């Protein structure tokens, strides 16, 4: 039995497969109906309206309906698309056992413990017929799949067959519906002529639990409490018992016919499912469960799937694997179908049977290995008991008759797997898991000791792949040695590329692609089962899951090509065609669209001409392609796909394409876009576009400064005029300062009432007339005339020597492949050199009316950007004598490769490589590696996600100390700055993909520092000890360890620090408490008692217990003091301490009572709240610190941990990560 899906739930009493979708309904004993997707292994929906167990359940064959019947006497019809009950049918007077839809008519058949069977019309929602005759509970009733018959099983020990042809004729006759509706109130409880008993089958000795028709033959199967499964045959006149299947040793719950084979399946309360051969009446297979009784069986109407419900849930299973055995060589496919070996020519599609296989094995062929040199095949058969597995060696006849193929004598031997390893040798893995090499006569030529393995696969001539529990090993048969290995668990299939350079290892939910040396190139995980695969001619691996055809590129990129209705097994991929076999062993050809993976492959292989061709001609659309191109560093290619202006804008900025970004910004006309474009243009020195952006965003201050630094005084004067119009005094004065216009500054100061400043400006700069006129306006009695500084110096902005009209010159580099293609495809004419406000159309700044101003008084931006004075696209010609041919001497001939565009000869700077610190960040998820790389932000993010750090202040010193160890410096040459080197801890293997930094802090260092903390605790320097313990605790997340033992030691170190910090902080707090009142003394004693429950070193625990003992003795709590004394003596203190303790103990035992009631129960386990220092007894809600594990009462959730001072209490985190092992 192959289990495909299993659920855990309450007892399952009913099951029904959906005829088309991969769904199954389960009705449970607790009243819930579950809808499962058994292919995706997910619960789709739950329906909970029945009161009590639900026993009957059935899907409708065409409509989105299902029916259920329960112990609440109700039949409910549900619509699973609407996810609700449509209506309820009432009429039964006791539990309903089964409910089934008719395959053709709108009928529902229900069987009940009220000893009746009812037929309901679900369209009119009425009962149309009641079948009476049984005199005990009716356990099951089902329609015949094609005839007007009903079979029922009852605890009255009979199986009855009912003829309902009268009901059909009545419902098809004219006026049937009207009479049906009129007569519904008068339905005869004791039956009508609509349904009559045709046969009564008696033979069971106990009550019958189930009866079912055969899908095509006139047979009935029944299962009963007499532990027997009976087969009955019927004709028009009679029915009789054919045979009985005995073997169950408890009540048989259910029995069904196999829809396509001569088999019967039954299950029982004896916790087993049995498969019976109908012709031999013998048991074929038995499947048992340890603790669960079986209650119901269901067969899928179209697929070879079955489901069984038991006490703990249900299972969906197959009796045997349906994967066809096949082998591909060149253009030929050999496969096994119906005990024939067939050969398919991929080119001509000629499919012929070449050989008949010997019969005898009841198990299908498991796998095949083909030898083209000798035209021989090895067919392996797996038994349920692996030790009984066999293989057959056949030589295929050369002149095969496709109509009547020969049945050559094969050589059969025992063995798990047989694989060809040479022209005339094959390897066999025998039942003892040792390797045998055999010749074509099936004779052993040698035995080879191999590493422990449970399966072998072909790996080229003379080589094998050996599978063990968690790896695959490449083994050389000739040299008897291991060549390479790769970690992957439970590989099921191995598929080599045509040139044997790559191999795909397929497991149940994973694919690992390796090269010939078994170096893993990529690892792909699938949620659904991987079924098969084949290599494309271009080196892409095409594989199938249960419901998809997918692709995988050796770099790790993978995706979906198309969806499948049913699983297929890929045999070959060529061009747009996928050749495959289905589960019926029929060869099929599916058409796929390879554009997506060929596009990615061309990008990876840098075949940019192919990429550009596909970009322009293929229908490659979607966000995934754009995201992929961005991720891989090709934003300029992504520009080809994008129509959305916002996305085009961000992509154009990313690849530095200012022209396309400008077009997109004009289309969007968004302030944020103009600001971003201005920033990027400024970085490129394109001040003309910067000017436009500042104009569009009305950023006057930046625009004025831009005009100042480019020396454009004319436009700066216009900006001053605009500021005056806008009544912006500050901007007006600032522009006057930029221009060095003193008289304008004096005027501005005078107009805004700053007479003193205006006078000083005029007098200092020598504007005597203006100064005198201002001086006269001062009132000598009220105002004082300011004094002029005799040492004043002239501060004048430097006059521009050469105004900057053109953009900042950029280094000319040869354009990338795609940028060039975009340029050739794009509009002609680059951005013009001059973006001038004068083009608005004014002769000067005399009158406001002549300015084209917006509501803010700002000049509208020019529209004519990018056009020359003479217009677009005009070429030289006319009067220019440039077309004349000159006769040049032959020695001046220049090779054609040297000439060309101006771009070709320019220097192309090499692309900047990845820095060592960036490599460290890329290769590691450990916080300390990011700190050593100087990437504090990512290190903080990792610490936040892993251990919940939210307060990074205490980490500042640790970060800086760690970062200082991240690099070394050395003097290279005199007069040159020092050089840096970046030490790696894996320096032998360090590189772009696996380099990680050397770490200075070791676990042993922290353990040594722990000893100092112990010493400080012993001498009573508690505050200093807490500080040192906390320093160790915060340092643990910055460790890197190599093995699981060290991970455990680091966790133990955290526990030690936590115990001491909580205990010592509580002791410090206790010593600060006043001792005047009794309540205060009780609180002091409680805290001392709690401290004795910290996990401390014995030397410290002795001190803690002595303190608690003294305090409790003084409080006259002798009973509790006695427990402390006994614990103290168990630790073996010094003799003088032990003597004193025994005296106190004897005094306490004379009067074993407690004078005061304290909040302390030594017998009830508890944790100490690290904030309130009160006990949290086991079973009470508790929140924990994600790093230290310190416990807190729920009210402290979300606060800073008192132990670490950096983490958030109760935060949900990934967990401490200090080793690469924790990421595997």
Swiss-Prot record:
Q: Which residues carry this modification: Phosphoserine?
A: 173, 402, 1193
Keyword Secreted in annotation: yes
PROSITE patterns on file: WD_REPEATS_1, WD_REPEATS_2, WD_REPEATS_REGION
Cellular localisation:
Cytoplasm; Golgi apparatus membrane; Cytoplasmic vesicle, COPI-coated vesicle membrane
Q: Which SMART domains match?
A: WD40
What GO annotations for molecular function exist for this entry?
A: hormone activity; mRNA binding; structural molecule activity
Modified sites of kind Phosphothreonine: 185, 591
Question: Which InterPro entries does the entry mention?
Answer: Beta-prop_COPA/B_2nd, Coatomer_alpha_WD-assoc_reg, Coatomer_asu, Coatomer_asu_C, Coatomer_complex_subunit, G-protein_beta_WD-40_rep, Haem_d1_sf, TPR_COPA_B
Q: Its GO CC terms?
A: axon; COPI vesicle coat; COPI-coated vesicle; cytoplasm; extracellular space; Golgi apparatus; Golgi membrane; growth cone
> What are the WD repeat spans here?
7-37, 49-79, 91-121, 133-163, 203-233, 247-277
Q: Which residues carry this modification: Omega-N-methylarginine?
A: 965
The topology of this chain with respect to the membrane is:
Peripheral membrane protein
The UniProt keywords, alphabetically, are:
Cytoplasm, Cytoplasmic vesicle, ER-Golgi transport, Golgi apparatus, Hormone, Membrane, Methylation, Phosphoprotein, Protein transport, Repeat, Secreted, Transport, WD repeat
| Source taxon at top rank | Eukaryota
Please give the SUPFAM superfamilies that the UniProt record associates with this protein.
Answer: C-terminal (heme d1) domain of cytochrome cd1-nitrite reductase, WD40 repeat-like
The biological process GO terms on file are:
endoplasmic reticulum to Golgi vesicle-mediated transport; intracellular protein transport; pancreatic juice secretion; protein localization to axon; protein localization to cell leading edge
Pfam families found in the cross-reference section = B-prop_COPA_B_2nd (PF04053), COPI_C (PF06957), TPR_COPA_B (PF23953), WD40 (PF00400)
Q: How does it assemble?
A: Oligomeric complex that consists of at least the alpha, beta, beta', gamma, delta, epsilon and zeta subunits. Interacts with SCYL1. Interacts with JAGN1. Interacts with TMEM41B. Interacts with SVEP1. Probably interacts with PEX11A.
Its biological purpose is as follows: The coatomer is a cytosolic protein complex that binds to dilysine motifs and reversibly associates with Golgi non-clathrin-coated vesicles, which further mediate biosynthetic protein transport from the ER, via the Golgi up to the trans Golgi network. Coatomer complex is required for budding from Golgi membranes, and is essential for the retrograde Golgi-to-ER transport of dilysine-tagged proteins. Xenin stimulates exocrine pancreatic secretion. It inhibits pentagastrin-stimulated secretion of acid, to induce exocrine pancreatic secretion and to affect small and large intestinal motility. In the gut, xenin interacts with the neurotensin receptor.
Provide the protein name: Coatomer subunit alpha
């Amino acid at each position: 039995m192959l289990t495909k899906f299993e659920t855990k739930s309450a007892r399952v009493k009913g099951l029904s497969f959906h005829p088309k979708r991969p769904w199954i309904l389960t009705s449970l004993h607790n009243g819930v109906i579950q809808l499962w997707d058994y292919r995706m292994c997910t619960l789709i929906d739950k329906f909970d309206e029945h009161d009590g167990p639900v026993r009957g359940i059935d899907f409708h064959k065409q409509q989105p309906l299902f029916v259920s019947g329960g112990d609440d006497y109700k039949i409910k019809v549900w619509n699973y698309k609407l996810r609700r009950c449509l209506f309820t049918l009432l009429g039964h007077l006791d539990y309903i056992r089964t409910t089934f839809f008719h395959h053709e008519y709108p009928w529902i058949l229900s069987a009940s413990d009220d000893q009746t069977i009812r037929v309901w019309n679900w369209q009119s929602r009425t009962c149309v017929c009641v079948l009476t005759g049984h005199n005990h509970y009716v356990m099951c009733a089902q329609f015949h799949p094609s005839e007007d018959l009903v079979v029922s099983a009852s605890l009255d020990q009979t199986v009855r067959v009912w003829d309902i042809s009268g009901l059909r004729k009545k419902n098809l006759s004219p006026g049937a519906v009207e009479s049906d509706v009129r007569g519904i109130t008068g339905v005869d409880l004791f039956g009508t002529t609509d349904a009559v008993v045709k046969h009564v089958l008696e033979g069971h000795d106990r009550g019958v639990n189930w009866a079912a028709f055969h899908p095509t033959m006139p047979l009935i199967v029944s299962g009963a409490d007499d532990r027997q499964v009976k087969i009955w045959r019927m004709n028009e006149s009679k029915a009789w018992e054919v045979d009985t299947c005995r073997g169950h040793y408890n009540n048989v719950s259910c029995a069904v016919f196999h829809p396509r084979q001569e088999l019967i399946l039954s299950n029982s309360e004896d916790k087993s499912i049995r498969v019976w051969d109908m012709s031999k009446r013998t048991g074929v297979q038995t499947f048992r469960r340890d603790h669960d009784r079986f209650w119901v069986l269901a067969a899928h109407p179209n697929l070879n799937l079955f489901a069984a419900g038991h006490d703990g849930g249900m299972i969906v299973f197959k009796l045997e694997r349906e994967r066809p055995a096949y082998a591909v060589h060149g253009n030929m496919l050999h496969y096994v179908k119906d005990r024939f070996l067939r050969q398919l020519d991929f080119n001509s599609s000629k499919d012929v049977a070449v050989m008949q296989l010997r019969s005898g094995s009841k198990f299908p062929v498991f796998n095949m290995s083909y030898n083209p040199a000798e035209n021989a095949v090895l067919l392996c058969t797996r038994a349920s008991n692996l030790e009984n597995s066999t293989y057959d060696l056949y030589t295929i006849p050369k002149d095969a008759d496709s109509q009547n193929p020969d049945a050559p004598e094969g050589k059969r031997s025992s063995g798990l797997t047989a694989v060809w390893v040479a022209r005339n040798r094959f390897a066999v893995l025998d039942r003892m898991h040792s390797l045998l090499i055999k010749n074509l006569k099936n004779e052993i030529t040698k035995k080879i000791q191999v590493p422990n393995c449970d399966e072998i696969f072909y790996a080229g001539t003379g080589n094998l792949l050996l599978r063990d529990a968690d790896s695959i090993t490449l083994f050389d048969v000739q040299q008897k040695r291991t060549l390479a290995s790769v970690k992957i668990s439970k590989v099921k299939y191995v598929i080599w590329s045509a040139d044997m350079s790559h191999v795909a290892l397929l497991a149940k939910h994973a694919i690992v692609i390796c090269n010939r040396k078994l170096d893993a190139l990529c690892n792909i995980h699938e949620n659904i089962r991987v079924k098969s695969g084949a290599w494309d001619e271009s080196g892409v691996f095409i594989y199938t899951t249960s419901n998809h055809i997918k692709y995988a590129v050796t770099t790790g990129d993978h995706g979906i090509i198309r969806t499948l209705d049913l699983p297929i097994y890929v045999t070959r991929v060529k061009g747009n065609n996928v050749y495959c076999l289905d589960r019926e062993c029929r060869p099929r050809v599916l058409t796929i669209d390879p554009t997506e993976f060929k596009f990615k492959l061309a990008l990876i292989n840098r075949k940019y001409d192919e990429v550009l061709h596909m970009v322009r001609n293929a229908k490659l659309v979607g966000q995934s392609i754009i995201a992929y191109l961005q991720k891989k560093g090709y934003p300029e290619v992504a520009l080809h796909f994008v129509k959305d202006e916002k996305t085009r804008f961000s992509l154009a900025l990313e690849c530095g394409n200012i022209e396309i970004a400008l077009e997109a910004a004009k289309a969007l006309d968004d302030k944020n876009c103009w600001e971003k474009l201005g920033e990027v243009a400024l970085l490129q020195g394109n001040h003309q576009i910067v000017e436009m952006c500042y104009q569009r965003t009305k950023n006057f201050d930046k625009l004025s400064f831009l005009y100042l630094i480019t020396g454009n005084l004319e436009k700066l004067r216009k900006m001053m005029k605009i500021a005056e119009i806008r009544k912006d005094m500050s901007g007006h004065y600032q522009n006057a300062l930029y221009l060095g216009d003193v008289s304008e500054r004096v005027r501005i100061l005078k107009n805004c009432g700053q007479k003193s400043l205006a006078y000083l400006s005029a007098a200092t700069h020598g504007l005597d007339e203006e100064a005198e006129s201002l001086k006269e306006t001062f009132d000598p009695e009220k105002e004082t005339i300011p004094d002029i500084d005799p040492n004043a110096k002239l501060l004048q902005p430097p006059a521009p020597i050469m105004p900057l009209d053109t953009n900042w010159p950029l280094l000319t580099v040869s354009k990338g492949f795609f940028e060039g293609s975009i340029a050739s495809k794009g509009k002609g004419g680059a951005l013009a050199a001059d973006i001038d406000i004068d083009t608005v159309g004014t002769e000067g700044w005399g009158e406001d009316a002549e300015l084209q101003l917006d509501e803010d008084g700002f000049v509208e931006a020019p529209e004519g950007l990018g056009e020359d004075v003479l217009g677009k696209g005009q070429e030289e010609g006319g009067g220019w004598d440039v077309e004349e041919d000159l006769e040049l001497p032959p020695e001046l001939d220049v090779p054609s490769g040297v000439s060309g565009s101006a771009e070709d000869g320019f220097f192309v700077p090499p692309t900047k490589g990845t820095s060592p610190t960036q490599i460290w960040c890329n290769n590691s998820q450990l916080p300390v590696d990011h700190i050593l790389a100087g990437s504090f932000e990512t290190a903080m993010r990792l610490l936040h996600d892993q251990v919940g750090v939210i307060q990074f202040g205490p980490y500042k010193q640790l970060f800086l100390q760690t970062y200082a160890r991240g690099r070394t410096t050395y003097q290279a040459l005199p007069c040159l700055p020092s050089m840096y080197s970046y030490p790696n801890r894996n320096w032998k293997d360090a590189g772009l993909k696996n380099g990680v930094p050397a770490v200075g802090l070791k676990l042993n260092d922290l353990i040594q520092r722990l000893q100092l903390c112990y010493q400080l605790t012993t001498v009573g320097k508690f505050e200093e000890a807490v500080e040192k313990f906390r320093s160790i605790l915060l340092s643990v997340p910055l460790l890197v360890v190599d093995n699981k033992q060290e991970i455990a030691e680091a966790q133990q170190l955290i526990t030690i620090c936590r115990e001491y910090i909580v205990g010592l902080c509580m002791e410090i707090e206790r010593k600060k408490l006043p001792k005047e009142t009794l309540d205060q003394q009780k609180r002091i004693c409680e805290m001392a008692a709690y401290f004795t429950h910290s996990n401390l070193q014995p030397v410290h625990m002795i001190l803690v217990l002595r303190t608690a003992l003294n305090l409790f003795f003084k409080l006259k709590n002798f009973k509790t003091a006695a427990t402390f004394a006994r614990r103290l003596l168990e630790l073996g203190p010094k003799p003088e301490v032990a003597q004193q303790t025994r005296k106190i103990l004897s005094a306490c035992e004379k009067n074993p009572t407690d004078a005061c009631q304290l909040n302390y129960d030594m017998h009830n386990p508890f944790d100490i709240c690290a904030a309130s220092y009160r006990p949290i007894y086991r079973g009470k809600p508790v929140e924990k610190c994600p790093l230290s594990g310190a416990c807190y009462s729920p009210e402290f959730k979300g606060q800073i941990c008192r132990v670490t001072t950096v983490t958030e209490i109760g935060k949900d985190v990934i967990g401490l990560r200090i080793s690469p092992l924790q990421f595997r």
